[in-house]
């Protein structure tokens, strides 16, 4: 089954080259690599254009759910693999995903570790091996058959944040989920710019707001107000 890797970007010049270089080196020859940019003002687009095997889709809408859906709409693969720009999958990701799907799973993710080896970050990462909803999220990457993705109508574009949680929550009600017992490597940049305690508290608050049906716009606004980003 052909795989399509879909990467949403917005001002990711610090990370996108590393990810695309890794994917070109480790993906199968027929695997499709799609970058969906939401209107970057930095060098993200120029960097993506350096890779001849990358299909770059430029949009002016900076909405991750929309970008992911647009990538999926144009993807030719039977399996979709959604990867954030600041994440590196294991070198074995192609085989891992193939095995997970062939074993009867419809969608899944990885565990993660951070690229900074602080003790408290190791504690956070440790939880991602467990099948708790709070432990999920797009940082762990997400693979899903295109058939299942289409049956769920993709990501809900009303979710301007936490679209990954919404998708997984809906998918788990109907389809079989698998956590691959290997780690992707996630950037700890958010923790470098903010305190460990602050990021965890904002994440916890955002999760409970999501679970209790609070407005995605309100969750996003609070998230951006309370945390510092690049």
Language-model regions: role of each:
Residues 11-25:
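Short, well-formed alpha-helical segments that are part of the catalytic scaffolds
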Residues 91-119:
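Conserved donor NDP-sugar-binding/catalytic core segment of glycosyltransferases
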Residues 37-45, 87:
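A conserved acidic beta->alpha catalytic loop
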Residues 80:
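Short aromatic/hydrophobic "clamp" motif used to bind/position activated sugar donors
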Residues 20, 30-39, 57:
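Short beta-strand/loop segment that forms part of the nucleotide-sugar
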Residues 14-18, 42-50:
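Acidic helix N-cap motif at the loop->helix transition within catalytic regions
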Residues 172-230:
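Hydrophobic helical membrane-anchoring modules
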Residues 59-75:
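Glycine-rich, basic loop-to-helix element that forms the pyrophosphate-binding segment
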């Amino acid at each position: 089954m052909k795989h399509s890797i879909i990467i949403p970007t917005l001002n990711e010049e610090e990370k996108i080259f590393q990810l695309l270089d890794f994917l070109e080196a480790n993906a199968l020859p027929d695997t499709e690599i799609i970058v969906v940019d939401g209107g970057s003002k930095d060098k993200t687009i120029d960097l993506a254009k350096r890779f001849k095997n990358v299909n770059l889709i430029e949009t002016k809408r900076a909405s991750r759910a929309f970008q992911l859906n647009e990538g999926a709409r144009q993807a030719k693969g039977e399996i979709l693999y959604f990867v954030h720009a600041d994440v590196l999958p294991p070198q074995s990701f192609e085989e891992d995903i193939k095995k997970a799907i062939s074993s009867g799973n419809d969608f899944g993710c990885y565990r993660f570790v951070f690229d900074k080896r602080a003790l408290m970050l190791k504690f956070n990462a440790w939880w991602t091996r467990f099948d708790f909803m709070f432990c999920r999220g797009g940082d762990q990457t997400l693979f899903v058959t295109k058939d299942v993705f289409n049956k769920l109508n993709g990501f809900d574009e009303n979710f301007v944040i936490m679209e990954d949680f919404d998708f997984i929550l809906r998918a788990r009600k109907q389809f079989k989920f698998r956590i691959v017992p290997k780690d992707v490597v996630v950037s700890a940049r958010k923790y470098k710019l903010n305190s460990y305690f602050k990021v965890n508290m904002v994440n916890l608050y955002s999760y409970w707001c999501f679970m209790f049906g609070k407005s995605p716009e309100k969750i996003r606004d609070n998230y951006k107000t309370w945390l510092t980003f690049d």
